[in-house]
């Protein structure tokens, strides 16, 4: 079953990891031709800032899933509910904090670099993209349960379908030469709709998450989350600061140029990650199976992942100059 779930997760991720960049290349080229490089750079920079504001999502996901692996493997619903109820309280508090900090950041963001838009328009664009991420914290609890139970493909296929539909709609907006605000609205709505649908699917598969049992809240999630937040922040500081530095010193136009060229490497990275990260939750289940030879299986997979990544890395190094 672990192999089957890993394969399903990989297949869904791989298809969309290939399809989305194709639409993305078309969309970026058309967006720049119609609205200009500076507006494209503005959008890229806003998304980078929001990535830092949204640091808790991936951190919480990892911390929450780690706690759920064992009770899910043992089918201990009361333990899952106890962890879930404790985590949901933190999610809601964090969602409110992200919305408040996002609003304050939006007011200050136009001062970061010279914007192609007026002050009010820049703040509005930031809020349109930021608010859905804050609201997503009120929806994401059940999503992490289905992911931890190795069935991410059930929600991911819908999330990625919406992402592809988003790209198609954006291309349509550009072809009709509608105002750029529609692009930002589509981007923001996609985040909220994807999380809402994923939540509905997760609750349909785990209706007992809605049970109002008088179980004590488990605070283990809060203890684990603080470590994963630090880990996630270090990753963001390494990989997501380029655009911010370029914008601050060189402006939004150069950010657009840099973002267009880095799009290729980011797309290849997502394809590799789809293969490497798909079995993660299955490994979590495996490590909680006392009868499984988990160490040897993990070692074989790790060696295979390093081998594939090395080959692809060398190929990119050779051809990136010509690109």
Predicted features along the sequence, with ranges:
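Hydrophobic alpha-helical transmembrane segments
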Residues: 16, 123, 127, 156-204, ...
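Signature of the first transmembrane helix
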Residues: 5-69, 99-102, 132, 167, ...
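Helix-loop junctions and terminal segments of transmembrane helices
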Residues: 58-74, 147-148, 206-207, 261, ...
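N-terminal membrane topogenesis motif
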Residues: 1-24, 41, 78-85, 120-122, ...
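Alpha-helical transmembrane segments of multi-pass membrane transport and lipid-handling proteins
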Residues: 18, 88-114, 128, 168-176, ...
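Membrane-interface junctions at transmembrane-helix termini in multi-pass inner-membrane proteins
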Residues: 3-7, 133-159, 171, 181
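Interhelical loop/hinge segments that connect adjacent transmembrane helices in multipass membrane
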Residues: 1-6, 180-181, 196-240, 244, ...
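Alpha-helical transmembrane segments of multi-pass membrane proteins
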Residues: 104-107, 116-139, 156, 160, ...
């Amino acid at each position: 079953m672990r192999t089957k779930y890993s394969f399903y997760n990989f297949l869904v991720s791989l298809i969309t990891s290939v399809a989305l960049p194709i639409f993305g290349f078309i969309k970026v080229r058309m967006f720049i031709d119609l609205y200009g490089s500076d507006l494209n750079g503005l959008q890229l920079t806003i998304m980078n800032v929001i990535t830092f504001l949204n640091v808790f999502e991936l951190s919480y996901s990892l911390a929450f899933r780690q706690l759920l692996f064992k009770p899910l493997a043992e089918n201990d619903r009361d333990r899952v509910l106890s962890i879930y109820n404790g985590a949901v309280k933190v999610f809601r508090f964090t969602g409110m904090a992200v919305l408040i900090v996002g609003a304050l950041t939006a007011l200050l963001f136009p001062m970061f670099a010279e914007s192609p838009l007026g002050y009010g328009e820049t703040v509005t664009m930031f809020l349109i993209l930021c608010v859905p991420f804050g609201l997503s914290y009120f929806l994401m609890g059940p999503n992490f349960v289905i992911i931890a139970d190795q069935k991410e493909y059930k929600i991911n296929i819908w999330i990625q379908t919406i992402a592809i539909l988003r790209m198609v709609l954006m291309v349509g907006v550009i072809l009709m030469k509608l105002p750029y605000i529609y692009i930002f609205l589509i981007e923001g709505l996609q985040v909220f709709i994807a999380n809402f649908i994923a939540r509905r699917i997760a609750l349909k598969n785990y209706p007992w998450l809605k049970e109002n049992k008088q179980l004590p809240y488990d605070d283990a999630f809060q203890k684990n989350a603080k470590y994963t937040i630090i880990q996630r922040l270090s990753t963001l500081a390494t990989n997501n600061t380029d655009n911010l530095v370029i914008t601050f010193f060189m402006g939004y136009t150069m950010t657009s140029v840099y973002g267009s060229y880095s799009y290729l490497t980011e797309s290849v990275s997502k394809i590799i990650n789809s293969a490497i990260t798909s079995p993660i939750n299955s490994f979590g289940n495996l490590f909680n199976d006392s009868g499984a030879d988990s160490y040897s299986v993990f070692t074989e997979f790790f060696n295979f992942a390093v081998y594939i990544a090395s080959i692809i890395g060398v190929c990119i190094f050779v051809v990136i100059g010509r690109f």
